């Protein structure tokens, strides 16, 4: 019967398993350390995201504020020309007209450089995206054809900045 109660070998095996298996306190400490590392990484990622959002907002504000900076710089030469014309002691009408013509060419060149183009609708079919009809008139032209331009329109790239004010032909009755 004493042989049945000998359990030295299993106790030794269980004892050796106890030595290799970490205790609950060690597992808890390891889990707490991992959780602290993950929390710290999350806080850093959150701070980085907030910094990126703030920098992006600042970049948008700067872009909005200085979007016309180069356009404005180009217009300074036009302003200088107009001021020089006004400063002339006794400009003749021809000289003044030549100066205004050159200034208009300068201004048109600046507009072209920045993709600001005239809308020239005379003789074209009325387009409500590009034209604003002020009046419908009797004309020999086909119906809905622009017959008179009262004020030029302008496009910036593909967007209408200001529609052309036009008179449109009425359909023949």
Swiss-Prot record:
Q: Which CDD domains match?
A: GrpE (cd00446)
Which residues lie in Basic and acidic residues bias regions?
Answer: 1-20
Its Gene Ontology cellular component terms are: cytosol
Keywords recorded for this protein, A-Z: Chaperone, Cytoplasm, Stress response
Recorded GO molecular functions are: adenyl-nucleotide exchange factor activity; protein homodimerization activity; protein-folding chaperone binding; unfolded protein binding
Q: Where is this region: Disordered?
A: 1-23
Where in or outside the cell it occurs: the entry states: Cytoplasm
A single GO BP: protein folding
Pfam families according to UniProt: GrpE
| Coiled-coil intervals, chain numbering | none
The subunit structure is: Homodimer.
| Family label | Belongs to the GrpE family.
Cross-referenced NCBIfam families, in alphabetical order? PRK14139.1 (NF010737), PRK14140.1 (NF010738), PRK14150.1 (NF010748)
Which purpose does this protein serve, as stated in its record?
Participates actively in the response to hyperosmotic and heat shock by preventing the aggregation of stress-denatured proteins, in association with DnaK and GrpE. It is the nucleotide exchange factor for DnaK and may function as a thermosensor. Unfolded proteins bind initially to DnaJ; upon interaction with the DnaJ-bound protein, DnaK hydrolyzes its bound ATP, resulting in the formation of a stable complex. GrpE releases ADP from DnaK; ATP binding to DnaK triggers the release of the substrate protein, thus completing the reaction cycle.
Protein known as: Protein GrpE
Q: Which organism is it from?
A: Thiobacillus denitrificans (strain ATCC 25259 / T1)
């Amino acid at each position: 019967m004493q042989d049945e109660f000998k359990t030295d070998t299993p106790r030794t095996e269980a004892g050796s398993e106890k030595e290799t298996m970490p205790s609950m306190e060690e597992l808890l400490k390891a889990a707490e350390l991992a959780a602290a590392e993950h929390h710290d990484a999350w806080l850093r990622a959150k701070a980085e995201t907030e910094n990126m959002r703030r920098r992006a907002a600042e970049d948008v504000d700067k872009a909005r504020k200085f979007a016309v900076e180069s356009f404005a710089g180009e217009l300074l030469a036009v302003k200088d020309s107009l001021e020089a014309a006004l400063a002339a002691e006794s400009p003749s009408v021809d000289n003044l007209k030549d100066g205004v013509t050159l200034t208009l060419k300068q201004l048109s060149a600046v507009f072209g450089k920045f993709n600001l183009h005239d809308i020239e609708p005379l003789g074209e079919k009325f387009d409500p995206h590009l034209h604003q009809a002020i009046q419908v008139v009797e004309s020999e032209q086909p119906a809905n054809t622009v017959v008179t331009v009262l004020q030029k329109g302008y496009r910036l790239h593909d967007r209408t900045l200001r529609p052309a004010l036009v008179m449109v032909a009425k359909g023949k009755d």
